[in-house]
Regions:
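Conserved N-terminal phosphate-binding loop of PLP-dependent enzymes in the Aspartate aminotransferase
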Residues: 31-485
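N-terminal mitochondrial targeting presequence
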Residues: 1-48, 483-485
Length: 485
């Protein structure tokens, strides 16, 4: 809160709310002395005592820890007050033992929930066996993961994947894809004329120089300009502009089938078909960035698997859920693309390490389960039922629902950041994207009861922001990149 009440004023009230949930008995005296606190402070104390997870006070253990660490950290993020230290399933706890229901999954990372028992077991076992040996040598798990990704992609209706490059993150996966597209273009046109790369407004492909050059937001590109030359930017879902955008000079086109950071914008089938057709006409590589929307978040292993074969890409990039919190990424390519890559063209020191690959092998095996994918679609339907009710309650605020599966966006007519604050102080973590959009990317294992619980909290938070008197400050920084305003 903007004017946080010091913890010593509310500690007595908060102690009454024990972790067991058993209320303490209070006996009123025959005559209660009137409070000597100013009315504003008294109201603030009463309000804070009524919240399930009020943000830590300025004199709290949390604040002291943050203040001691902040001077040593490069200020790349704006963070809200809680400090998280423990997670289980769809819940996460801060260092003062406040529990939060997590609708963010670490930005679509923890698809199997926090501290999944199988993931934890593999981390323990493999860390005692072999963690890293470099890509100068073979290990049992890099090839096993690559084979599994290829086989599950084909079984799940995805593109003609043939080979895999394993790395450490989504940005690295996209950097590899960009390099592979450039190499493909050089193979077709050795004079280097086929070098241009195309991406789209509203996209987010990463923060390294290549992936940032593919992310056309002037606010974030300008401090690091000039960008890598050869990038062109088009309008998402604009079929009419494709032919002028993608030309004989184009070596590659990179697109998110569902834009995550951009606002949960879904590419139309017609647009993706036209894009594939044009890439084939000019001999350009089509790259689908499925880092956020892939690995069964849409109800299929890959979002593009819902498309006709004629719309499928040549390269797919993935990360996030691939490691369920462990840093790992991958770039999947067709045999045609792979045939242009030779020894020494690309590499990584840590990528493909046996620890990460063994983890990812377990995770992909489980996320590719058809029953899990069916459940994702059932859970989407449950979320949408709640969205209908919330729209009926706030018809002037809720404008649209976008997305597929468990990557959903609720478009608001007003700034959503106060809702983020109000939800967090009531026990729910949710994030934003695009412009005035609430983003829902919970663990894929979330239960119906947890969905219901979270949506009840969200409605309460929206009621506090849009109907009750008083100011709730916004929580900024709850998305990777905020659109220019």
């Amino acid at each position: 809160m903007a004017a946080r009440v010091c913890s010593k004023h509310v500690s007595a009230l908060l102690r009454a709310r024990t972790s067991t949930g058993v209320p303490r008995r209070c006996y009123a005296s025959a005559a209660t002395a009137p409070s000597t606190l100013p009315a504003g402070q008294r109201q603030a104390i009463e309000r804070e005592a009524s919240l399930r997870t009020p943000d830590p006070a300025a004199d709290s253990q949390t604040a002291r820890l943050v203040e001691s660490h902040a001077p040593f950290m490069v200020p790349t993020y704006v963070r809200p007050p809680p400090v998280f230290h423990k997670g289980e399933g769809c819940y996460i706890w801060d260092i003062e033992n406040r529990r939060y229901l997590d609708f963010t999954a670490g930005i679509a990372v923890n698809a199997l929930g926090h501290c999944d028992p199988q993931v934890s077991k593999i981390l323990y076992e493999q860390s005692k066996t072999l963690v890293h040996s470099s890509n100068l040598y073979y290990n049992p798990w890099t090839g096993a993961l690559s084979q599994l990704l290829v086989e599950k992609t084909r079984e799940g209706g995805g593109f003609d994947a043939a080979r895999v490059f394993v790395c450490n993150s989504g940005s690295e996966a996209n950097e590899a894809a960009i390099k592979f597209a450039r190499k493909y273009g050089k193979s077709v046109q050795p004079d280097g004329s086929k070098h241009e790369l195309v991406s789209f407004q509203g996209s987010f492909h990463g923060r390294t120089m290549g992936s940032l050059s593919a992310t056309p937001n002037p606010k974030y590109q300008k401090p690091f300009s000039p960008m890598i030359p050869g990038f062109k930017y088009g309008t998402y879902n604009d079929i009419a502009g494709i032919n002028d955008l993608v030309t004989e000079k184009t070596c590659g086109v990179i697109i998110e089938p569902i834009q995550g950071e951009g606002g949960v914008n879904v590419a139309t089938q017609e647009f993706l078909l036209a894009l594939r057709k044009r890439c084939t006409e000019v001999g350009a590589v089509l790259i689908h960035d499925e880092i956020q929307c892939g690995l069964s978040r849409t109800g299929k292993l890959w979002a593009h698997a819902a498309l006709p074969k004629e719309a499928h890409p040549d390269i797919v990039t993935t990360a996030k859920a691939l490691g369920n919190g462990f840093p790992i990424g991958a770039t999947l390519v067709t045999e045609d693309v792979s045939s242009k890559i030779v020894t020494g063209d690309h590499g990584t020191t840590y990528g493909g390490n046996p620890l990460g690959c063994r983890l990812a092998h377990n995770i992909v095996t489980r996320l590719s389960d058809p029953e899990l994918q069916k459940d994702v679609l059932k859970k989407e339907a449950r979320f949408r039922q709640h969205f209908v009710r919330i729209h009926e309650a706030f018809p002037d605020v809720v404008q649209e629902v976008r997305g597929r599966g468990l990557i959903l966006g609720l478009q608001l007519s007003a700034d959503p950041t106060p809702v983020i604050t109000a939800a967090r102080e009531r026990g729910l973590l949710v994030i934003t994207c695009g412009t005035n959009t609430l983003r829902f990317v919970p663990p894929l294992i979330i239960s119906d009861a947890e969905i219901d619980e979270g949506m009840e909290i969200l409605e309460s938070a929206m009621n506090a922001v849009f109907r009750e008197p008083g100011h709730i400050p916004g929580t900024d920084g709850q998305q990777e990149m905020r659109a220019s305003r």
